[in-house]
Structures are given as C-alpha cells and as structure tokens.
Amino acid sequence: MSTNKITFLLNWEAAPYHIPVYLANIKGYFKDENLDIAILEPSNPSDVTELVGSGKVDMGLKAMVHTLAAKARGLPVTSIGSLLDEPFTGICYLEGSGITSDFQSLKGKRIGYVGEFGKIQVDELTKHYGMTPDDYVAVRCGMNVAKYILEGTIDCGIGIECIQQVELEEALKEQGKDSNDAKMLRIDKLAELGCCCFCTILYIANDKFIAENSQAVKKFLKAIKRATDYMLAHPREAWAEYGNFKPTMQTDLNTKKFQRCYAYFSESLYNVHRDWRKVNNYGKRLDILPENYVPNYTNEYLSWPEPKEVDDPEKAQDLMLKHQEECKTCGGYKRLVLA
C-alpha cells in the first residue's frame, strides 16, 4: 500500500552532514511533495540496516560497505542515492601515542571501532602487514572514538576526516597544542583501494517499501536534491537555518565539521557505479560478500541527468586531500572543482 508518511532513520544522532534531510523538512520541500517525513535518530548506529531491512523503518542512512553486507545477510535494503561521497576514513591517532605511519606500530595498541565491520577491516589489514588480529586490542566505541582517544581509553580508532578528526584537532587546540598532531592512517591507502568509497554515506530504503511507493521515493529524492542545491549555493544561510532548528549544531566545533563536510556532499545524489564495483570487490576480499554478489543500488528514482564519472579517481583523491588541508587552515565553504 502506498503512503505519503515516511519514517527516516539517521545513521547517528543529528550531525552536520545530515543537513540536507533536515533542510528539506525545515524549508517545506517535503511538504511541497505532499510527503510527511518523520526523521528519527538511532540509539545504536549498528541497528539502522536491520530496522530498515525489517520494514520497521522505511528509509535511512548508512555507509556503502554496511549496505552491501546487509543485503548479503538477507536484509532487503537498497541504496537509492548518495549523501556524502568518499569522506577520508582511517585510523585516527595522536602524535606521541607511539603510533606512526607504519601500520606495524599498531601492535599492542587498543584500536577503537564503531561497528563490527571496522574490526573486520583492521583484521584484514593485519594479514598484509605481517600481523594477526591478536596483535592488537579491539574496543567497540560506537560514535565515541575521538572522546575515547582523548580520555586515553583507546590509543586510536576508526573515524572520518570531517568528524572524528576535527574533534581531535579542536581538542588539541583547546589544550594549546598543535592541531596537526591529530593524525590518520587512511584505510584506502593501507588497503590499496584507490578510493574511500566504502564509507560513502547513502540514502537507503526497504525493498518492499520502494516497490509499493516508487513515486514517494522519487518525491523524497527530489526534495533532498532541492535541499542539497540550496545548501551548496547558500551554505552559511543553510547552516544558520539548521542551527535554529537543531540548537546542538550551534557550536564552533560543529561549524568546523560542516565546513569540512561541505566538499564531500554529493551534488547529484547519484550512486557512482565505479565506486560500487570497487567496494563490492573489497567486500569479497573481506569475506562479507559471496563471489557472485550483485551490488544493491539503483539510480532509477533520480529524475535529473547523471553526471560523468571522474576520469582519474586517485588524482581526485589527492586533490581532495590538498583541498581539505586548505579548509582545515582557512575554514570557509569551497567545493573541489576538477578540470
């Protein structure tokens, strides 16, 4: 049965990069499409794919590797679009912790991770660096990786550059220390993946819900695209509106996170075919996907032109690294423009 009432589950408590979803609600874009969206926050981020897959929630947000693994485990979920494209993801640590750019420096260290796939990724990496999973201590942290590093509960942990890395940098500044002492061992470099696409944040939906509500899905994405376009064109105004609706966003820390997220937002919302192929292969390497697995994504419900894929994704990642370093130093809102 089709419906205009949709439950939408975030992948975490409200964060700066959730702004398109909230803006679509704040500015009445969902209402313009005759949609009534209930935006929900999970008590446990690991529950999202299970709740969406079970049909208890209609739609949500989740990273690409989790979305692939969920379908492989029998949960009927499909990606219908992209929110945050390839945020740099890796093992965050502080200078002076005994950890260096050498992966083997992680021997004996306490490594924090959000959910089970973070541990699977680190375990797989140990095989390539003359180690075993017994050579480190895994600590499940949920979304508290930066907090636990600063408290000394863990030595390092998996996070993304525009969130946990920013938290570490700003904490160092408050202590009168150099923010450059917040470091990251990028997983895409360690695993030689050629992209950080495994952590691309996606709009996902329950398969039965999609089948019964195809027009509502199209309308939802149309409203999200409208909100994304507004945010990219007017980032300061959009951020102020989000902060008025969600006062927890009104901090210097969250503003800096939003500035660092800004370049990662997907303008088109399209699932990138090459990224899905790469992460599908990576999932097989991690033994979380069968060899014959077909990626569970579709661009069918996006009603605007699909952009051309980047010619050289590795070069684009190098340029993004420089871009994000500039954003860290200067702040502001600037998109990476590829020639």
Swiss-Prot record:
The keyword Iron applies. Its cofactor is Fe(3+). Keywords: Iron, Metal-binding, Pyridoxal phosphate, Thiamine biosynthesis, Transferase. The modification N6-(pyridoxal phosphate)lysine is found at K62. It is an enzyme of class 2 (transferase). One of its GO terms (biological process) is thiamine diphosphate biosynthetic process. It comes from the Eukaryota. The active site is at H66. One of its GO terms (molecular function) is metal ion binding. This is 4-amino-5-hydroxymethyl-2-methylpyrimidine phosphate synthase. It catalyses: N(6)-(pyridoxal phosphate)-L-lysyl-[4-amino-5-hydroxymethyl-2-methylpyrimidine phosphate synthase] + L-histidyl-[4-amino-5-hydroxymethyl-2-methylpyrimidine phosphate synthase] + 2 Fe(3+) + 4 H2O = L-lysyl-[4-amino-5-hydroxymethyl-2-methylpyrimidine phosphate synthase] + (2S)-2-amino-5-hydroxy-4-oxopentanoyl-[4-amino-5-hydroxymethyl-2-methylpyrimidine phosphate synthase] + 4-amino-2-methyl-5-(phosphooxymethyl)pyrimidine + 3-oxopropanoate + 2 Fe(2+) + 2 H(+). The gene is THI13. Pathway: Cofactor biosynthesis; thiamine diphosphate biosynthesis. Homodimer. Pyridoxal 5'-phosphate binds at G115, E116, F117, G118. Pfam families: NMT1.
